[in-house]
Amino acid sequence: MKVILIKNAVETLGYFSEQLAETFQEMGHDTYFVDYDDLVNTVDGISRFAVPEKTVLCTFNFIGLSGEEVFIEENGRYIWENQGIACINILVDHPLYYHSKLAKPPVPEMRVFCIDREHVAYMKRFYPALPVQPDH
């Protein structure tokens, strides 16, 4: 598996991404960073790194899924969707801050993970059609 992560958008979330990258690499997975300090070059590198259906974006709080123009291609779809990259979105903040994106997910195959059990319960109550992990 190949994993794309994002850094330098939000300091703490970049740190979390770096820690995840280390673990993914220890597990034998290839990793690639989209760097907000060098967006043009690192976004260009996605197409060279990604293998359709074998690559995932692992992001936090909809970074890279919030309508950023750099990730939207000419056909109006996200690069993730066009390149067959699955999206794992880890919500660190409460889901209520992302109502518009949860009500109408930016990509069809997005998996949402919450770090708080109360957030999972909230998701199941207000967005029952959207799969959320962990599923307690």
Task: Please identify what each model-predicted range represents.
Residues L13-F126:
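Extended catalytic core of nucleotide-activated donor transferases of GT-like folds
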Residues Y122-H136:
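Helix-loop-beta element that forms the nucleotide-linked donor phosphate-binding surface
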